Every structure is written in structure tokens, then in C-alpha cells.
Amino acid sequence: MKRFDSLAFVDIETTGSSCNRDQIIEIGVVRVTEMGIQEWHSLLNPHMQIPLMIKQLTGISNSQLEQAPDFADIAKELFSLLTGCVFVAHNARFDLGFLKNAFKRVGLEFAPSVLCTVRLSRTLHPQYSRHNLDSLIERHRLSTESRHRALADARLVHQFWQRVLTEFDEEWLSQVLIKLIQHPSLPSHLDFDLVKQLPQTPGVYLFYGENDLPLYIGKSINLKQRVMSHFSADHRQSKEMR
């Protein structure tokens, strides 16, 4: 699978779920190329207090970040590390949204090919209902030294990828990956085949949330185009699937 010879498995920890309001506090990368495996990690100073919930989740304290670099200090090094690689992350919309915003603030446009391993897991194992990282650890017997630390979680995503490579036929898997990468902006739980069936005609559409409660009703002269437009931008997303 030549197209997938250069991969960057990425995880971030943040002060919250909004890529516009919150800040990155830790980044971990496992870069896999034909030259081998390279790991990269950095804490970041968010210049704001870490919420207690985040401190308890990650174990990262405010005092640890006081002397950490700003994102601007590591941006060029990180950008160079990620350039030319497929960006692989668990619930990739979350990590990508934060990183695109952070790079944009320092004048860099970050627009990689993206592979979400939540969507990959759903595609490869549709018989399971849960595809968060803890479920993958249990299901695939992944080894972990800790959870909710950036480099440790990036290593877990890499481990899952290694399991996938040994479990599935290479030619078939390559087609699956190409399809997923071509539609990276869709939410991890949304079936692309369902979206593909939408007509390009006038009509009304309805989004449902949990417990089948309606969230949004819209209308358009082109249903498919309009529904897809809801997912074309970078969205805030919680770490529910991580």
C-alpha cells in the first residue's frame, strides 16, 4: 500500500472540547515511514488554567505547563514532521480541528490527508457498537502504559493500525482506506453509503440526536449538497470517542 507508507499517528490533549475557545496542552506523534518509526512529544503552555476535570483525566497540572513552550515555538518542527504523511487519529476531526486552528494562528495552512481510526474500526468491525479507544484496547488486546496522555494514546492508535494490517487482505483494505480518506469530514459515526444515497433534488431533511430526538430541520433545492455542507467545515467535537 504505497499511498500509506508515510503515516503520522497523532493525539492531543486539550483544556476542553472547543477548538475555538480551548487550547492544546500536549501533542504526541508516532511517525511511520519507510525510514522507520520516529516519536515526538511536547507539552504546551495554554496560558490559561487547566480545568480540574482535565487535570484529573490526564494527570497534567498547571505547574507542569508553566515552563512548557508555546505552540508557536514548536509549530515549524511539528509542521515539518507531519508534512507528507497521512494524518491518523482516533476521532480525527477533534485533533485536526485544534491543530488546523493552531497552525493557522502562526501563519501555516495545515491540510493533510486524514484517516480516522474510529471510522476505520466501524467499517472493519460493524458487528460492534462501541469503537472508542478503551474498547479497542480490550477488543484487540492493545498494550498501554497510560491513558489520556498524548504520546501513549498515539502509540495505541499505531498498535491498532498494526493489528489491522495483519487481519485484513491488503488489496481490499487499500480500497477501504482510500474511501475513508476521500471523505474525512464526515462524523465518525455516519455511514457514507447512507449519505451517498441522498438525492440531488429539492426536499426537507431532519437530523436526529440521542434517543431519536430531532436536532435540526432544514430544506434545500439540493438535499445531498446541503447535507454534506454541514460537515465540510472543521467542527467542535468532544473526546467521547477517544
Question: Where are the language model's segments positioned?
Answer:
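A residue-level signal for conserved active-site and pocket-lining positions in enzyme catalytic cores
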Residues: 59, 88, 153, 157, ...
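Short hydrophobic beta-strand that contains or immediately precedes a catalytic carboxylate
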Residues: 9-10, 115, 215-217
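Extended, hydrophobic interaction surfaces within ordered domains
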Residues: 61, 116, 120-179
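Conserved non-catalytic scaffold segment of RNase H-like nuclease domains
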Residues: 1-112, 126-148
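A positively charged, amphipathic N-terminal helix/segment that binds anionic biomolecules
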Residues: 165-242
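DnaQ-like (DEDDh/DEDDy) 3′-5′ exonuclease domain used for proofreading
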Residues: 1-25, 152, 156-194
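Conserved beta-strand -> loop -> alpha-helix junction used to position metal-binding or nucleic-acid-contacting
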Residues: 109-122, 242
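Short, glycine/acidic-enriched loop or turn micro-motifs at the edges of active sites
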Residues: 14-16, 94, 119, 156, ...
